[in-house]
Amino acid sequence: MGFLKLLSTSLATLAVVNAGKLLTANDGDEVVPSSYIVVMNDGVSTAQFETHRNWAANVHARTRSLKGGESGPGKHFDINGMKGYSASFDDRTVKDIASDPTVKYVEPDMVVNATANVVQRNAPSWGLSRISSKKSGATDYVYDSTAGEGIVIYGVDTGIDIGHADFGGRAEWGTNTADNDDTDGNGHGTHTASTAAGSKFGVAKKASVVAVKVLGADGSGTNSQVIAGMDWAVKDSKSRGATGKSVMNMSLGGAYSRAMNDAAANVVRSGVFLSVAAGNEAQDASNSSPASAPNVCTIAASTNSDGSASFTNFGSVVDLYAPGKDITAAYPGGGSKTLSGTSMAAPHVAGAAAYLMALEGVTSDKACARIVELAISSISSAPSGTTSKLLYNGINAQ
């Protein structure tokens, strides 16, 4: 399915050791050897942060001869005051790092992979018509002509084929934290961006789209790469003067990660709406990140008969459902493809957020609540404890 996840056999919560600061992955979680995400205490100043990073580099330099190969502090981030960095350390050094009183916690970096896509050849796409009608079976997508104009959508994914005709020149390349290839060699990112803002396949047909590549052509990456992309997008939104008028779609996730959840929460606090796929494991989404992060809009997948998709995650952290089974959208090379997954559901909501921001002037911090307010109670088979709300754009269509 289209959901991008952390490859693991267990989604149990990370155990906490070393006075609550050095987190350890459970057996079965696929960690990057000797690689970590270091998160600083709230309120640490830029000067204190730089002092710590210099100290960490010196500590690492003194101990790396014990094992070799580790590179020390790497990319750093500052997401709305959440400061930290990714690093490659030996065991002795990481314990020293965790003991620093300015460090909040250290978490192992983990691998991110794409799950297999479910493809139905030449299947019709029904998602757009469904979100503009209070009843199932509609064939037309009805929307206001503002169509997300003036709103920026960041696609944090495998990249975007920005030259695809479905974007009509509204897509641009932002950054790449995954590799040195500024293309979408996977297709997932182009599909999700098209669902959010494509001229033919998208919800917000006039919104701008920015590619934030955090996963490679094979759909693989790390939490640290994803967080680096989120950090870049928040800073770019501020530089554009688009705070409160920006949307981020993350059709990815996996095993619970405190660092990922903290980063996601800070994205929202910074003034960027964040739509997140609930996951495709048919389990409680509270076990997944960033689906379980506070203040994000967590989206489950529905079918064209208003059922809860068999694969979708569920539970109290789900804010609403959106179409996620057999969704057709743009694909690299100028064509289109039909895919299924909560990855397909989340960008419907990202597009709806951009649509309502342009139409009603809703700010990013209020967008999820407004979307839930407009949603209709149509999901007949929602698991116990899960909302029955389905995305609706509020247009007066039947």
Curated annotation (Swiss-Prot):
Glycosylation sites: 113, 249
Ranges for region Disordered: 175-195
Site for Important for catalytic activity, residues: 280
GO MF annotation list: IgE binding; serine-type endopeptidase activity
Ranges for domain Peptidase S8: 125-398
pH dependence, record text: Active at neutral to pH 8 with casein as substrate.
Key words, A-Z: Allergen, Glycoprotein, Hydrolase, IgE-binding protein, Protease, Secreted, Serine protease, Signal, Zymogen
Propeptide span(s): 20-115
Signal peptide range: 1-19
Location(s), subcellular: Secreted
Known regulation of activity: Inhibited by phenylmethanesulfonyl fluoride (PMSF) and diethyl pyrocarbonate (DEPC), but not by benzamidine.
GO cellular component: extracellular space
Membership in a protein family: Belongs to the peptidase S8 family.
Summary of the function given for this chain in its UniProt record: Serine protease. Hydrolyzes casein, gelatin and human collagen type IV, but not elastin in vitro. Hydrolyzes OCLN of the human lung epithelial cells at 202-Gln-|-Ser-203 and Gln-211-|-Ile-212.
Protein's name according to its UniProt entry: Subtilisin-like serine protease Pen ch 13
Record organism: Penicillium rubens
